[in-house]
Amino acid sequence: MNWHLYIPYKNTPRPADGHYLGQIASVYLNDDQTLIKRTYNLNGVTVNDSPSEYSAEFIKERWAREYRWINEFNGEFFMPELIDANYDEGWTVQKYYGPDLLIQGTSQIPNVEDQVLDIYKFLKEKEVYKKNGSLSNMTHDNGRLIAFDYKWTVPRDTPGDHKELEERSIDLWLSKISLDLVPKLKALL
């Protein structure tokens, strides 16, 4: 199978909110754009067309989180279909549903607010903070919201400022779906 580097973002100049997209994983699409492969390695080119500025140790730690959560949440109503993953080599292959919501918007998702709330209710039940609810980490499958990218996800009892980072994710990114979501999501924290 042939894989083609996927670079949907050029983060030049610095984005207005100061948050560069795609700083860790290299992303590839297969020939017919039905599968997406993400690799976690120090020498890759990220979706913003630059190498990661993170250390090998940092990338490995984020990969371990990604691997854990895509396997624990595999098959859930909001997860992309997992085709294959290799922990030792640091890659996943999932079904590709099309561009992320930052690119395609949310107009094709009839009840997007309810679906976001359902996902975050699930995450609360599982006692985790996702911490990156960016539209660039969501897509849809014929109106069904798909959330991906779990490398920042941590159990809620992990020491650190994770709750504050989840609030920031709500304020910066999930609020772009609807400002009405903000208090509802924060109530789940």
Report residues per predicted region.
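Conserved structural core of kinase catalytic domains
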Residues: 58-115
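Conserved hydrophobic core/spine positions of the Hanks-type protein kinase catalytic domain
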Residues: 115-122
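Protein kinase-like catalytic domain
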Residues: 74, 123-124
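C-lobe/activation-segment region of protein kinase-like
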Residues: 111-112, 125-131, 140-189
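Conserved protein-kinase catalytic-loop position immediately C-terminal to the HRD catalytic Asp
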Residues: 136-137
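Active-site beta-strand termini and strand-to-loop segments that position acidic
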Residues: 28-32, 95-96, 141
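Hydrophobic residues embedded in beta-strands of well-ordered beta-sheets
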Residues: 35-36, 90-92, 144-145
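ATP-binding glycine-rich loop module of kinase domains
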Residues: 11-67
